[in-house]
């Protein structure tokens, strides 16, 4: 069965059910329409779309220009003398020149004693001389010295606990066979090499700049030459045996400073520019979705039958496509600018990195959008995150690898808290990946970053903590995990946070069988309260009659809002509304602002879930089967659901497909409703060129498409010129024959002309129910006479004259010199005729001192409305 059909009888409408397969087709249809709409709006908004997609080009070109035409000292200071460098204290009141290990090697100690003697440095043993980590209480104020450590692992632990306190660590690996101490071979030497004459050691140099704005000295050569000098001096002074030749000195150096290539700015600040180019789409996504929420576009489409799930899926696919496109543009422009980061990296590593980051930020945007209701808030939050993230990138890019070593390899509560918090920030993992890749590609073309490097262990020299620096691949996986985390959070909070439409589910909604379609939602009923008005009581009785087969039956519909932190302050928007509406009837809702009219329509269209009660639309419950209700209903919302970038015809094509109208009937129906609202000649013009009245007429046309059985019209003629308003009124009257139309308006004249039945609501309660004549007869005063007194002094005389002339006359109200009186139509016609004759004679008398003018009319609906509101107010006092 098609999702659209012209129902010929009520039984077909009531029994109509859609199969699982048709439901799937309907979901895909909605997805296709939404994607088409997003594409069309993006193409028409070509300027903003261009900024969103092409922004990476601008940022990378700026980076390219800075890196090629910038100035500054790009190479660190290098020293080449054979003296041991002198340490400087930075964050702590102490510093050490060198740590060396192992402490159980007599030969290593002898060589370092010679180094200390040459450079006037003493040897301190850890922990006996220094105190235990992390306190090192015995070293406060110490400037210089050689610290003897048990192993290189202890040296690493030392550096992690106290960064920038020591220059380097030396780890001896082997001692030659002929080495002597006091003229004899060393006893218990664990490093003795039996088959060679080489002395091997490894130098681990601290290349962490204590000040990211300062240049970092390269002490590796100085320390190595100082140790070589100490070895040679030791052999010449302590070993005087000519048969023992000087050893072959072999050494290695870890953490050697990588000299910046020609484009130093691209290496240091590249992450900031790559981040900025990728984040523009994040801000645009926040704006575009919040715009549809703020302007009720999403709400309007949902009322017309749109699947909410497909709405969000369409935006996810749209943002996913833009994210992939932006990532490709970033990589292509980076390659075109010959930046080493891109030239030296595997393409798949780059596309995965940039795509996962932009997609993860889109997931963050969807999560934030569950709390955002306006474009102003969206732009403010988006720009705030962009600026904070830029500062974040600036600091992290400047500090490089050091910041990740501090975060992951510092054993403190602060570091632990930082690891937990930063894990949930996508830009942190993005920066980590960029830093890892940059550390390799900075040596391009000598080194390139390969796909296999994603699993490279980044913990140089091992780790002494339970935590380790994640591999690049792990950081990428964290981005993938955050996409899932924020997507699930967005899905969850979208259900429990009230949006513009006011709907929300309980926090445990996902465990309810009704959410997954395994059971129907239960309807909560409350006892029927007593109503003074007999017509209201009759309407309730008829609505509750089990034999009632009216197309629309409302039974005890109620809606209350309870404040989270003030549960006693419950606001009752609608209180027990019960009535039924027959086919071919226009029901008009009247009431002041906030009386519950729009809330009632919101419940009947499924935007709001009733607190109690239910409504049946051709037998389908708005609580348990809202999808079936939306297939046969349509809405003219209070706010136009229109996109400025689309034409009227495109809107009607969108909603006709949404309603499931067959393709062969679609064009004829579109043309029909365009003719009905007089928009045919301008149907291909963009909505941005329409006046407010034209937009309102188009909203009425959209509601009429698809031959709906029930149409909800929320103030349909607002902003329409008198001629078009008259035409719309005639249109509504002409289409009502086989339909039910629910109308709300503040225009009493409009309601009086259109409505077959009128309900006046006051503070959420149905105060009265009936047609225009019934209400006027019941609440009106029959005739209404307005008299303009000549002076304030004559007012009492005028009031006395009128009340004495007409039995049962009531003085209704006064406005300055204008007095209003009312009297019932049951008064004898001769008395009325004589009264009007007297009024005419008095006003024509030039010497009269009572009145200037007078007029007479029947009681209007305005009078009825004012009296009903006044009576209701008296009851609540």
UniProtKB/Swiss-Prot annotation:
GO terms for cellular component: intracellular membrane-bounded organelle; membrane. Residues 552-788 form the ABC transporter domain. The keyword Transmembrane applies. GO terms for molecular function: ABC-type transporter activity; ATP binding; ATP hydrolysis activity; ATPase-coupled transmembrane transporter activity; lipid transporter activity. PROSITE patterns: ABC_TRANSPORTER_2. SUPFAM superfamilies: P-loop containing nucleoside triphosphate hydrolases. It is a multi-pass membrane protein. The chain crosses the membrane at residues 46-66, 268-288, 324-344, 347-367, 379-399, 420-440, 479-499. ATP binds at residues 591-598. Keywords: ATP-binding, Membrane, Nucleotide-binding, Transmembrane, Transmembrane helix, Transport. The keyword Transport applies. One of its GO terms (biological process) is lipid transport. It comes from the Eukaryota. InterPro entries: AAA+_ATPase (IPR003593), ABC2_TM (IPR013525), ABC_transporter-like_ATP-bd (IPR003439), ABCA (IPR026082), P-loop_NTPase (IPR027417). It is found in: Membrane. Belongs to the ABC transporter superfamily. ABCA family. This is ABC transporter A family member 1. The lineage of its organism: Eukaryota, Amoebozoa, Evosea, Eumycetozoa, Dictyostelia.
């Amino acid at each position: 069965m098609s999702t659209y059909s012209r129902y010929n009888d009520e039984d077909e409408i009531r029994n109509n059910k859609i199969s699982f397969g048709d439901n799937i087709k309907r979901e895909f249809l909605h997805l296709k329409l939404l994607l088409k709409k997003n594409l069309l709006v993006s193409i028409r908004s070509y300027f903003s779309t261009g900024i969103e997609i092409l922004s990476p080009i601008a940022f990378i070109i700026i980076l390219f220009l800075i890196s090629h035409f910038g100035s500054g000292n790009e190479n660190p200071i290098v020293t080449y003398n054979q003296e041991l460098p002198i340490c400087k204290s930075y964050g702590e009141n102490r510093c050490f020149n060198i740590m060396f290990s192992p402490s159980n090697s007599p030969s290593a100690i002898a060589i370092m004693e010679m180094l200390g003697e040459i450079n006037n440095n003493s040897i301190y043993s850890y922990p006996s001389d220094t105190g235990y980590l992390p306190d090192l209480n015995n070293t406060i104020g110490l400037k210089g010295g050689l610290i003897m450590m048990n192993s290189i692992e202890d040296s690493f632990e030392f550096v992690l606990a106290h960064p920038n306190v020591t220059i380097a660590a030396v780890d001896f690996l082997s001692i030659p066979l002929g080495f002597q101490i006091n003229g004899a071979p060393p006893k218990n030497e664990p490093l003795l090499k039996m088959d060679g004459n080489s002395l091997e050691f490894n130098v681990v140099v601290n290349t962490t700049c204590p000040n990211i704005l300062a240049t970092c000295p390269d002490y590796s050569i100085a320390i190595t030459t100082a140790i070589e000098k100490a070895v040679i001096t030791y052999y010449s002074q302590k070993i005087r045996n000519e048969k023992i030749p000087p050893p072959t000195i072999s050494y290695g150096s870890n953490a050697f400073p990588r000299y910046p290539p020609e484009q130093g700015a691209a290496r240091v600040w590249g992450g900031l520019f790559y981040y900025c180019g990728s984040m523009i789409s994040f801000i645009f996504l926040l704006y575009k979705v919040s715009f549809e929420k703020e302007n009720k576009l999403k709400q309007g489409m949902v009322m017309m039958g749109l699947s909410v799930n497909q709405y969000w899926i369409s935006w996810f696919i749209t943002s996913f496509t833009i994210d992939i496109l932006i990532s490709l543009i970033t990589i292509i422009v980076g390659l075109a600018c010959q930046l080493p980061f891109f030239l030296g990296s595997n393409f798949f590593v780059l596309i995965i990195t940039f795509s996962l980051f932009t997609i993860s930020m889109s997931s963050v945007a969807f999560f934030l959008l569950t709390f955002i209701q306006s474009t102003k808030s969206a732009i403010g939050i988006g720009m705030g995150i962009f600026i904070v993230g830029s500062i974040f990138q600036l600091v992290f890019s400047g500090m490089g690898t050091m910041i990740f070593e501090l975060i992951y390899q510092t054993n403190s509560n602060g570091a632990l808290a930082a690891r937990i918090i930063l894990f949930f920030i996508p830009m942190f993992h993005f920066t980590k990946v960029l830093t890892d890749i940059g550390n390799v590609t900075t040596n391009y073309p000598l080194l390139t970053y390969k796909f296999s490097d994603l699993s490279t262990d980044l913990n140089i020299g091992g780790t002494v903590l339970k935590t380790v620096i994640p591999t690049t691949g792990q950081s990428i996986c964290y981005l993938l995990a955050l996409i899932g985390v924020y997507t699930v959070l967005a899905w969850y909070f979208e259900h429990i946070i009230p949006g513009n439409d006011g709907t929300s589910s309980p926090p445990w909604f996902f465990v309810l069988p009704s959410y997954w379609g395994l059971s129907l939602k239960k309807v909560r009923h409350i006892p029927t309260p007593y109503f003074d008005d007999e017509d209201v009581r009759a309407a309730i009785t008829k609505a509750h009659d089990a034999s009632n087969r009216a197309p629309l039956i409302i039974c005890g519909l109620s809606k209350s809002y309870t404040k989270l932190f003030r549960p006693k302050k419950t606001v009752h928007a609608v209180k027990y509304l019960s009535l039924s509406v027959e086919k071919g009837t226009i029901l008009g809702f009247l009431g002041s602002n906030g009386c519950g009219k729009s809330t009632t329509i919101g419940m009947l269209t499924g935007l709001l879930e009733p607190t109690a009660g239910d409504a049946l639309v051709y037998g389908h419950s708005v609580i348990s089967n809202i999808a079936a209700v939306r297939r046969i209903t349509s809405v003219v919302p209070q706010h136009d659901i229109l996109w400025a970038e689309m034409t009227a015809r495109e809107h009607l094509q969108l909603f006709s497909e949404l309603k499931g109208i067959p393709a062969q009937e679609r064009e004829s129906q579109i043309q029909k409703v365009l003719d009905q609202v007089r928009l045919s000649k301008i149907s291909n013009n963009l909505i941005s060129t329409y006046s407010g009245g034209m937009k309102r007429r188009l909203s009425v046309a959209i509601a009429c498409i698809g031959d709906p059985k029930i149409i909800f019209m929320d103030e349909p003629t607002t902003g329409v010129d008198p001629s078009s308003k008259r035409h719309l009124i005639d249109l509504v009257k002409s289409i009502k024959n086989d339909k039910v139309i629910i109308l709300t308006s503040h225009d009493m004249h409009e309601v009086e002309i259109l409505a077959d039945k009128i309900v006046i609501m006051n503070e959420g309660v149905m105060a009265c129910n009936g047609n225009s004549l019934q209400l006027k007869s019941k609440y009106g005063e029959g005739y209404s006479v307005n008299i303009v007194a000549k002076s304030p002094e004559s007012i009492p005389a005028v009031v006395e004259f009128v009340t004495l002339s007409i039995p049962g006359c009531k003085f209704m109200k006064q406005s300055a010199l204008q007095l209003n009186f009312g009297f019932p139509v049951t008064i004898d016609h001769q008395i009325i005729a004589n009264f009007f004759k007297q009024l005419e004679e008095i006003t024509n008398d030039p010497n009269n001192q009572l009145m200037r003018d007078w007029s007479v009319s029947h009681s209007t609906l305005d009078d009825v409305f004012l009296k009903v509101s006044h009576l209701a107010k008296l009851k609540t006092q």
